[in-house]
Design a protein with these regions (language model features):
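Structured secondary-structure scaffolds
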Residues: 2-50, 102-106, 156-371, 414-418
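Helix-rich, typically C-terminal accessory recognition domains appended to large enzymatic cores
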Residues: 122, 345-382, 394-501, 507, ...
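Cys/His-rich short segments
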Residues: 117-170, 174
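N-terminal catalytic cores of NTP/NDP-binding nucleotidyl/phosphoryl-transfer enzymes
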Residues: 2-77, 96-111, 116, 133, ...
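Phosphate-backbone binding interfaces of nucleic-acid-interacting proteins
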Residues: 540-657
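A glycine-rich helix N-cap at a beta->alpha junction
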Residues: 78-93
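Intrinsic disorder at enzyme termini
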Residues: 476-557
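Hydrophobic, well-ordered secondary-structure elements that form the walls
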Residues: 300, 418, 454, 470-472, ...
Length: 657
């Protein structure tokens, strides 16, 4: 193995334990995993940390709703989050929980240290508080009276609290950002932080709460708990052994400062303003880079349980497989702008990129090797300089192209480079036409060279795919090197060299289909609808019917229609029909009306009720009975129906309008 290029420490934001993560949340851990795997492949000694953020008022309230303790609640959710991360084949080295004993003790020490040196002081605050975001806002910061971060309702809050002196370190942070352009990426996030927060002037930050108990107690003032951001952000140092008393671990000394904090764009303020200022106050180096990635959205916007449009990773994995999901979220996310996910787009990518471009390439290559040479792949040296040279140039250049993209975290572009290699291999098959060469005895050595070139090219491509689709790489190498798949694993430095496969090795006799083509209507539609229906029921989401707006009428037109209160005197079923026959009292007259609602009501249920009827509808005969008006009902597309009744006891005959 080559010598290590040195330590590389990276983290994701720790997931908040308020519920099961959806595919938008899961995107971050897959993105981080692809970066960590690639850095390991390059030769770095990587430490990759993720975990769960487990304190706060929101969790306290959710636990109360569930009838369990906050610790039981976060234990359940943290286990579920870890299950999803493991399902996605993420190669984290540490999964930290903010309820871990070591973390909690260090947070208390950090709080006390900052208090003792005068960076934290006691005061009180008054403002508008957003419980889901656990953020306090002034009236002027609200957007249409709601939280500027999430758009939810806020409520007035006033309590005693400890505050951190943010303004003390603001100029130092501004200088750091200006002299380290790589610190905040993409650049648009940097501009946002400078212009919206730092340059206008920082307010001191509330770092404790007394209105709830589920948090780390301030040990010298146990009425207070440490506020979420000072608690959560410090996981990045406590997780690798930071000690506020100066006895930090060798691991901490090796890996800090972090090379990369990978977070969602919605929490970049906390990571590029609050976090570096906390570190400055502690006398610790700042992380080298904070990358605020975009969101993965549904077609109709950000995923939300309240919208009923959530897609979960495990549902996608059940239908498409882990690597197909990894490919999709990595490939579809631009560097800076939000990406979009839908079931239909997943099928499109599955068929065009995975089944056709990659799966078909591997299957054809293995099948032809078996058909023409009994699976033995030999290098004969019989080349077409132009065609073979172009293939080799593309293949050997791909490593450096992928590396350049990954260096700037353009992961979607990096994976596209790998698939460009596979597309070039498919073109090579069309150019060389192995089936035609096979018919000419004099071209057998040329045919063997063509198949060797294909197997070698796919081997290099599969190695470069490893960071993004690790299971698929293993499956490809198992088919190309069935006797010893490890023989197909290349050192990163060798991935720009063509021809390292030993001649005479066999491919598998039974090629495996890597990705099967799917038809959304035939294969998935019913399953997807069942998943969506189950989620809506579980989340209590109401699916509203689409409202079809009929042509407008004038007020004069509306006034022509007369609605009145009618009391049901008698009601009976009309035999051999769907009708109920009503005798109604409407003011001083009685009327007969029939209505096709027999399947929804028993006659006795309606006797004595007061209904809404249209009284000036021209009478018509229905099944031989003259109906002198219409009973007004509401119905939906699920075959539910309800006659309109009155909230208060209004005399029959009263006009409605």
């Amino acid at each position: 193995m080559p010598q290590s290029k040195g330590p590389f420490y990276m983290t994701t934001a720790i997931a908040y334990t308020s519920g099961k993560p959806h595919i938008g949340n899961t995107y971050e851990i897959v993105l981080a995993d692809s970066i960590a795997r690639f850095r390991r492949q390059e030769g770095y000694d990587v430490f990759f940390q993720t975990g769960t953020d487990e304190h706060g008022q929101k969790i306290e309230l959710k636990a109360e709703e569930a009838g369990i303790t906050p610790k039981e609640f976060v234990d359940n959710v943290s286990t579920e989050i870890k299950r999803i991360w493991d399902l996605m084949n993420t190669s984290y080295d540490k999964f930290i929980r903010t309820t871990d004993d070591y973390h909690e003790k260090q947070v208390q020490k950090i709080f006390k240290k900052l208090y003792d040196q005068g960076d934290i002081y006691k005061g009180s605050y008054e403002g508008m508080y957003c419980t889901p975001c656990e953020s306090l806002w002034t009236e002027s910061q609200l957007v249409d009276g709601k939280c500027p971060d999430c758009g939810r309702e806020v409520k007035p809050a006033k309590e005693e609290a400890y505050f951190f002196k943010m303004s003390k370190y603001a100029n130092k942070l501004i200088e750091h950002i200006n002299t380290h352009p790589e610190f905040i990426q993409p650049v648009s996030r940097k501009n946002e932080m400078m212009n919206n927060f730092l340059l206008p002037g920082l307010q001191d930050l509330c770092v404790s709460r007394t209105s709830f108990k589920w948090g780390i107690p301030v040990d010298f003032d146990d009425k207070h708990v440490v506020y979420v951001w000072l608690d959560a952000l410090t996981n990045y140092i406590t997780g690798i052994g930071y000690d506020a008393d100066g006895n930090s671990s060798e691991q901490y000394k090796k890996f800090w400062p972090a090379d990369l904090h990978l977070i969602g764009k919605d929490i970049i303020r906390f990571h590029t303003i609050y976090w570096p200022i906390f570190l400055m106050a502690l006398g610790e180096p700042l992380p080298k880079q904070v990358f605020g990635h975009p969101w993965l959205l549904q077609n109709d916007g950000k995923m939300s349980k309240s919208k009923g449009n959530v897609i979960y990773a495990d549902d996608l994995v059940d239908l498409f497989g882990v690597d197909a999901v990894r490919y999709f979220v990595l490939h579809e996310m631009p560097f800076e702008n939000d990406g979009v996910i839908s079931w239909e787009l997943m099928v499109e990518r599955m068929n065009s990129d995975l089944a056709n471009t990659l799966g078909n390439l591997v299957n054809r290559t293995v099948a032809m090797s078996n058909k023409y040479f009994g699976g033995v792949v030999n290098k004969t040296g019989v080349e077409d300089a132009a065609i073979d040279g172009d293939l080799k140039a593309v293949v050997t250049a791909t490593r450096d192209k992928v590396q350049a993209k990954m260096a700037t975290l353009h992961v979607a572009d990096a994976i596209t480079e790998v698939f460009t290699l596979f597309k070039r291999c498919n073109k090579y098959i069309d150019e060389t036409m192995p089936w035609a060469l096979a018919k000419d005895e004099a071209q057998q050595d040329r045919l063997a060279e063509v198949l060797y070139n294909l197997v070698e090219s796919i081997t290099i491509g599969a190695n470069l795919l490893k960071s993004f689709m690790p299971e698929t790489t293993d499956k490809i190498l198992a088919q190309l090197y069935p006797a010893n798949p490890e023989a197909g694993v290349r050192d990163f430095d060798d991935l720009a060299t063509f021809g390292l496969r030993e001649t005479g090795l066999k491919v598998t006799e039974t090629p495996e289909i890597l990705f099967a083509r799917l038809d959304f209507e035939k294969d998935l539609k019913e399953k997807v609808e069942a998943i969506q229906e189950a989620q809506k029921k579980a989340n209590g989401v109401t699916e509203y019917p689409q409202v079809e707006v009929k042509p407008e009428i004038t007020f004069d037109d509306f006034e022509k229609v007369q609605f009145r209160v009618a009391k049901v005197l008698t009601c009976e079923a009309v035999k051999k029909t769907k009708l109920l026959k009503f005798e109604l009292q409407i003011g001083d007259e009685k009327r007969t009306i029939v209505s096709g609602i027999q399947k929804y009501y028993k006659p006795e249920e309606l006797i004595g009720k007061k209904l809404v009827v249209c009284t000036n509808l021209k009478p018509r005969k229905i099944c031989g009975i003259e109906s002198q008006g219409m009973i007004i009902s509401a119905w939906d597309d699920k075959d539910n129906l309800s006659v309109l009744t009155l909230e208060k006891d209004i005399i029959e005959g009263a006009e409605i309008g």
